Amino acid sequence: MDLFEKCRKFTAAKEAIESGIYPYFIPLNENEGTEVVFQGKRLIMCGSNNYLGLTTHPKVREAAIKAIERYGTSCTGSRFLNGTLAMHEQLEKELAEWVGKESALVFSTGMQTNLGTVSALISRDDVIVLDKDDHASIVDGARLGYGKI
């Protein structure tokens, strides 16, 4: 029995590419956050995590450059394993002040963010409509919220 026979028989992706309807790895000419240029046409980007378009905001870019100059390109791991930096504490302090609370704690991952936020927003009497392609963290957050899915 050939373990890879099933893989060789799977041709849907190849057929989609050949027919020009493959939706992945689309080559973009420009990426301006909430808009992209594809084959010379400016389009709205609906698949991005840049919901507010802040990745291209001049103040965000400037702050990112300063952070890279001070800390490098990453923290190289989560706060749980590699420690909390001053910028983590500063962010939490500023967030707490902004919402008028004594303190704040930011989530360390996108998964945790969606689980915590979505589950907190949904109560037993709420109904949530999910897209079949929603990230697992959104679906799990909805389930944790006890609402009707």
Outline where the language-model segments fall:
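Conserved PLP-anchoring active-site segment centered on the Schiff-base-forming lysine
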Residues: T117-A136
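Active-site-proximal loop->helix
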Residues: A120, S137-Y146
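Conserved N-terminal alpha-helix of the aminotransferase class I/II PLP-enzyme fold
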Residues: E62, K66-G110
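General beta-strand structural signal in soluble alpha/beta enzymes
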Residues: M45, S103-S108, L130-D131
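Short glycine/serine/threonine-rich phosphate/pyrophosphate-binding segments
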Residues: V106, M111-T117, S137-I138
